[in-house]
């Protein structure tokens, strides 16, 4: 029986530095909400950093969707990634550019791997 991929880490930040010598990841400017003076607002750049385990060997697909209405989420990002073994921890650095928020609110966010939800959460955008 194949296990479901597990999300070990989900962090929103300003950037990720990867040390060329050690391969260690340093997360810069971690945040959990967005504040704006007026709406609509466009956030110029952020990184969604994920660590995933229990992925069977081979190619997989991650999709991240977002929206104010949790029943009508729009895909923001969809891309492939590879897994060598279910024992490996896979760090995925997802750069999000020019993300628009039409109004303040709690925006629902859904992360799926191979069309299977692994996290449903929200990000608060306030004025």
What does each model-found stretch correspond to?
Residues 2-127:
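Contiguous segments within soluble domain cores/interaction surfaces
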């Amino acid at each position: 029986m194949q296990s479901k991929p597990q999300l070990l880490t989900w962090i929103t930040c300003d950037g990720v530095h990867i040390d060329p010598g050690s391969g260690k990841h340093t997360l810069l400017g971690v945040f959990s909400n967005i504040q704006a003076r007026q709406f609509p607002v466009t956030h110029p750049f952020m990184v969604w950093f994920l660590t995933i385990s229990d992925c069977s060997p081979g190619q997989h697909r991650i999709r991240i969707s977002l929206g104010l209405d949790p029943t009508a989420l729009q895909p923001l990002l969809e891309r492939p990634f590879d897994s060598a073994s279910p024992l490996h921890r896979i760090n995925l650095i997802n750069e999000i550019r020019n993300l628009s928020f039409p109004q303040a609110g709690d925006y629902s966010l859904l992360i799926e791997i191979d069309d299977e939800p692994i996290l449903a959460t929200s990000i608060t955008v306030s004025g």
